[in-house]
């Protein structure tokens, strides 16, 4: 009985590892897609964009 339990646990671990390694199916559209730069302005550009959208809390001193 103990050997059967160990065998079932090992099988479950192997199956879950196989699913993690394979992941979801690779779609043809994903393979052909051109990667885009989500952070084209860098960290500073991202910060300035947020600052412009939300407004400056120190209005007289904002540049």
UniProtKB/Swiss-Prot annotation:
Entry-linked Pfam families: Conotoxin
List where Basic and acidic residues composition bias occurs: 28-39
Q: Which residues carry this modification: 4-hydroxyproline?
A: 57
* GO MF term list: ion channel inhibitor activity; toxin activity
Q: Where in the cell is it found?
A: Secreted
Q: Where are the transmembrane segments?
A: none
What positions are modified (Cysteine amide)? 62
Name the UniProt record assigns to this protein: Contryphan-S
Other notes on this protein? Exists in two forms, due to cis-trans isomerization at 56-Cys-hydroxyPro-57. The cis conformation is the major form.
Segments carrying the region annotation (Disordered) are 23-49
